[in-house]
Design a protein with these regions (language model features):
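Bacterial N-terminal signal peptides
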Residues: 14-27
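Bacterial Sec-dependent signal peptides at the C-terminal "C-region" and cleavage site
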Residues: 24-36
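Active-site-proximal loop/helix of nucleotide/amide-processing enzymes and allied scaffolds
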Residues: 33-39, 89-102, 106-196
Length: 196
């Protein structure tokens, strides 16, 4: 990952400060269970944007990734998606005036050999390392949100929330939970599923 300029870091700090002020001004906000209007707006943008990116991600069987944040005019926006491989994606650095508030990526097409319906431990670790929340869409059309402060990932919406891979086959014996912590995902990754 490339080093960010001091100006970019200042813009990130400014966005974080504005977000903290918004959270303080919104009484009753507590963790993942309650959402502020800014977060709701971000969730809506995330689902709409991932819905647009998902079809190409499935067709190309590649992860796509990028960022959500404030553009130079202060508008909440998404960066253009970067194409990755079938198992990873490294986002291009956004313009210097873009203030990152969250990351996003897709999991590509369905595969019976890959647990792509939940974020991976690497997905969570990357968001924790960047100190930025992360959105993920899955082949079934689920959307997940990793909340860095709470160190948890929650399923924002279930199958079909964004355009799904039509070849997706659910595995009832390995159905995703509604939320995971990093250790929960480690257990899931090491679990052997006999059959679907």
């Amino acid at each position: 990952m490339t080093e960010c300029s001091p100006t970019f870091r200042l813009l990130q700090l400014k966005a974080a400060l504005l977000l903290m002020i918004a959270l303080i001004m919104s009484p009753g906000l507590v963790g993942a269970e309650t959402r502020s209007s800014l977060t709701d707006e971000l969730d809506i943008l995330a689902v709409e944007h991932l819905d647009k990116v998902q079809a190409e991600s499935v067709r190309e069987n590649s992860e796509y990734c990028g960022f959500f944040g404030f553009d130079g005019s202060g508008k909440l926006a998404a960066t253009e998606p970067t194409k990755g491989s079938y198992f990873a994606c490294e986002s291009d650095q956004p313009p210097e005036e873009f203030v990152i508030v969250a990351s996003y990526h897709t999991h590509g097409a369905y595969s019976a050999h890959y647990d792509s319906e939940v974020p991976s431990t690497d997905d969570l670790s990357a968001d924790f390392e960047r100190h930025v929340d992360g959105y993920l869409s899955t082949p079934a059309g689920r959307v997940w949100l990793t909340l860095v402060e709470e160190m948890v990932t929650i399923q924002l919406c279930g199958p079909g929330c964004v355009v799904p891979d039509t070849t997706f086959k659910p595995c009832p014996s390995d159905a995703p939970a509604s939320k995971y912590r990093l250790n929960d995902l480690k257990v899931r990754e090491n679990k052997i599923v006999e059959s679907c």
